[in-house]
UniProtKB/Swiss-Prot annotation:
Gene3D superfamilies: 4'-phosphopantetheinyl transferase domain. Transfers the 4'-phosphopantetheine moiety from coenzyme A to a Ser of acyl-carrier-protein. Its main location: cytoplasm. This is Holo-[acyl-carrier-protein] synthase.
Amino acid sequence: MIYGVGTDIIEIARVQGVMERTRGRFAEKVLGADELAKYHARKARSERRGLAFLATRFAAKEAFSKAIGLGMRWPMTWRAMELMNLPSGEPTPICHGELAQWIAERGITVRVSVSDERDYAVAFAIAERGGHAAVPENPA
């Protein structure tokens, strides 16, 4: 059963502007530890791909927060949910701490899709309840 849906779109140039104004601290505020490591690896290869990665993760967190009905309020925080990829490439939300507990208590599963083009990054999330395992705290 559908619990909620969420979507977000962001202009990549806006993310670039925030990164310049914050001297890169924006990435540290928004990304979890595993996401941050992946961001730095992508940025080292291509500044543009690093920004696109950051923008898709920002959009994914916004879409995820809307799908679960909390918005960006406790226990949903920027770093409480990381969007990582399975070996197949499928993006998978990984929840930590109190958010993982909140999701598990409600039996919610969330699927997220992200995409980016030259100017924009977009994310869509669908939260379901019943008949599925909850979003894991740690990838298997």
